[in-house]
């Protein structure tokens, strides 16, 4: 060590033995300079501060006599020498030699006896009139008047919020001493340091140094030991009286009193309905942490996230943040961890993480919804309205609520033809085509439980999708009374069987029956149910008359509808 007048007592017995057994006497007659000699062996490029009288320093040294014989070394003790400068705790020459040094500077110092231990020396250790040479490396410097030093080297353009007392933060850091020696790093553990600020969970200097930081900000916080681990250090990696330097990157910030934050990005001009508790939503989202790290995205799966809201199917913050949205709206929802995944996190979401969801609402509905019909045009004569059993020809465009086109008969160049009320379209469409006249144009909105349900149509219609149909009715053929597939337009001949049985053999075959029915339809005397396969209707009619199933109908088997209610017959 660089000996103080009283510090010599701390020398170890080992060093004393080395001196007694191995140290040669000083060379007599050698001219000794009375001046302090300082050679700056290495000076760092950056030197923000130099030693002044009154500063506290920590340094390594090797002490030798002029002949090169070592008499002491801090390296041998694996500990720096720590002392105030200019307060008489050092020999005068060392007190002077340390002034003006930078951290990481190396000096060769030659101290004459008059600035060291003089003509008396130290009995048994330092001979009288000894010139002492010290190889000094300064590793730390601070002053009792120092405060926490903050140097911000990156600050994001947007800083809507800064750290306040009682906030909870997540940050990465590298912890070094003033000489750059690393003593700890959250990066090495691949885990942020998570803590409250300003309530005593941190060393005082860090509590102060974090205040005012923005998420995304990077700063260097330099802390004197009396605001860090003091004289004792931490008992492990940090020695006593060490100044600490923390290179901090703030990733996350919230307060336990925080609620969700909602920022509307795009709100459609027309918003006829806003989501309520109990509604079922389909939406896309990107989920990120506050520092922008992506943890999930519905877009990457090419599938919306579909859920009920207000019923606990999603985290509380999203349950709240999805209320009051419009179809087509884009909004940002910021969710504090106590309304997200809490202290434990989930999957790639770390514990105590604030979550940011950028959402796009595709559609929503309520299980109690029915279809919605908006008529855009009706012709002057709109007296004949569609009903169950009518045969309809119409054009349509089918889309999702966000405007995504699913299908169009106009693009196909042909109409869509159905018999109303016979399950040939989804229930919502069947309902939406009722009481419509030829030439009318209307928009029908169909909730999924009246459309294609949760399953949708693979590759065509997403599951749980609300559908929008823009319809134009082009043709309407009135159907038959319910339960009939064929009716007479006039009186039925009393000799009907004989008219069908042209060969008069008392038996009617399918060919005879079919020829006769088609002839009646062609002449306008009879009518088949429109929209169905005529041959199948005729065959079913014949089968119903063929009671014994022998492929022919006799006069005894032949009956009209009103004569036999169990069969759909003539």
From Swiss-Prot:
Gene3D superfamilies: 3.10.50.40, EF-hand. The keyword Calcium applies. Residues 1-24 form the signal peptide. SMART domains: EFh (SM00054). Pfam families: EF-hand_5, FKBP_C. GO terms for molecular function: calcium ion binding; peptidyl-prolyl cis-trans isomerase activity. Inhibited by FK506. Phosphorylated. Ca(2+) 2 binds at residues 546, 548, 550, 552, 557. This is Peptidyl-prolyl cis-trans isomerase FKBP9. It comes from Rattus norvegicus (Rat). The gene is Fkbp9.
